């Protein structure tokens, strides 16, 4: 390794050291930093230098080949969170990658016990399941591959049998539980117990979303393109589709009591007989006001955010700007257009200008 590479690696290790110093080993969200692209390749740093708690480091040491999947799972979760909420008042803002030790990746929302916390934990757990399962199906790991329970049998009467490579989502879910879930009994404070129980439930809700959207794919076999026999296998849905399901769960999330007796129950007394389903997203505290800046909580507010003047949805100026109104300014765009290939051998284009109205919240 040359001198420049060694210097870069030492600087990266120093950044991770800052993260570990500010956030102790018990913190659940540290691993999420692995999804930030500018942090480099965690495999080169080694398990001991990564922002993981003691249990995760031990698992990392025993299964170092899973590091690329862990990093990809974090990246998937972060990307989908930002995509699903890009037009909302809370837009899943992450901390600056240039200052990795100044705050948790998702800031206040990671520990606030709100609906936003619920979505973060669910989508990150789902991302880990998705990436590990994909890696298994691709043959990148020795201890998992395709789902062996779906390699024989089928329905001869319906003319199909199991074949191909079914995604082994059960292994992905097992690893996600092993890597992310921590026993509640190790926590003493009542408030911490409630939040930890909530986070564990939402982790599982994220995993259930991946399992629920498993689909059946089939390929036909027969003479002259007929479908006399079909070979079928189960595959995971795109992570975007999983993100849409979790966003719907977020919109219909259930508020629970901040007191745990034998089990969690709904906050509203008249609804406590309604059972909590394992795929529900749960939250304890109401969300703060995301309309205005709150430096203490790290909430930037919506001032200066671009909005859609004609939309009635969350991205519309009326909702996104919280009734404060909006400013309009004209943006001039210059681009190449009407390009033609000239023989021989170059491309000639015109410069085209266009004007666009851009609306931003006051």
Curated annotation (Swiss-Prot):
Leader sequence segment: 1-29
GO biological process, one term: cell fate commitment
Residues where lipid is bound covalently (O-palmitoleoyl serine): 224
UniProt xrefs under InterPro entries: Wnt, Wnt16, Wnt_C, Wnt_CS
Keywords: Developmental protein, Disulfide bond, Extracellular matrix, Glycoprotein, Lipoprotein, Secreted, Signal, Wnt signaling pathway
The UniProt record lists the keyword Disulfide bond: yes
Domain of life, source organism: Eukaryota
Protein name according to UniProt: Protein Wnt-16
Organism field: Bos taurus
Gene: WNT16
């Amino acid at each position: 390794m040359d001198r420049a590479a060694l210097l870069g690696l030492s600087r990266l290790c120093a950044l991770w050291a800052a993260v570990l110093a500010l956030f102790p080993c018990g913190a659940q969200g540290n691993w999420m930093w692995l999804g930030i692209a500018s942090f480099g390749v965690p495999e080169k740093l080694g398990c001991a230098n990564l922002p993981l708690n003691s249990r995760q480091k031990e698992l990392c040491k025993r299964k170092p080949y899973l590091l690329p999947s862990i990093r990809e799972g974090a990246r998937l979760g972060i990307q989908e969170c930002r995509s699903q909420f890009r037009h909302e008042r809370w837009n899943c803002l992450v901390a600056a990658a240039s200052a990795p030790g100044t705050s948790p990746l998702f800031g206040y929302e990671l520990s606030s016990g709100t609906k936003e916390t619920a979505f973060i934990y669910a989508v990150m757990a789902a991302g880990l399941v998705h990436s590990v399962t994909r890696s298994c199906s691709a043959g990148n790991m020795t201890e998992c591959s395709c789902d062996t329970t779906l390699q024989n049998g089928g329905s001869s009467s319906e003319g199909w049998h199991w074949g191909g490579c079914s995604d082994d989502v059960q292994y992905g879910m097992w690893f996600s539980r092993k890597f992310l879930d921590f026993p509640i009994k190790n926590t003493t404070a009542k408030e911490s117990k409630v939040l930890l129980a909530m986070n564990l439930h939402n982790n599982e809700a994220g995993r259930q979303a991946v399992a629920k959207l498993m689909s059946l794919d089939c390929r036909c076999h027969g003479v002259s393109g007929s479908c006399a026999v079909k070979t079928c296998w189960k595959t995971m849905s795109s992570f975007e589709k999983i993100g849409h399901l979790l966003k719907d769960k977020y919109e219909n999330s259930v508020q629970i009591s901040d007191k745990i007796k034998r089990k969690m129950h709904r906050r509203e007394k008249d609804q406590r007989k309604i059972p909590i389903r394992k795929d529900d997203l749960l939250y304890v505290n109401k969300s703060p006001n995301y309309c205005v800046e709150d430096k203490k909580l790290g909430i930037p507010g919506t001032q200066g955010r671009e909005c859609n003047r004609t939309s009635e949805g969350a991205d519309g100026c009326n909702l996104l700007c919280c009734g404060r109104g909006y400013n309009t300014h004209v943006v001039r765009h210059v681009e190449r257009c009407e390009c033609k290939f000239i023989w021989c051998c170059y491309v000639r284009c015109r410069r085209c200008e266009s004007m666009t109205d851009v609306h931003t919240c006051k």
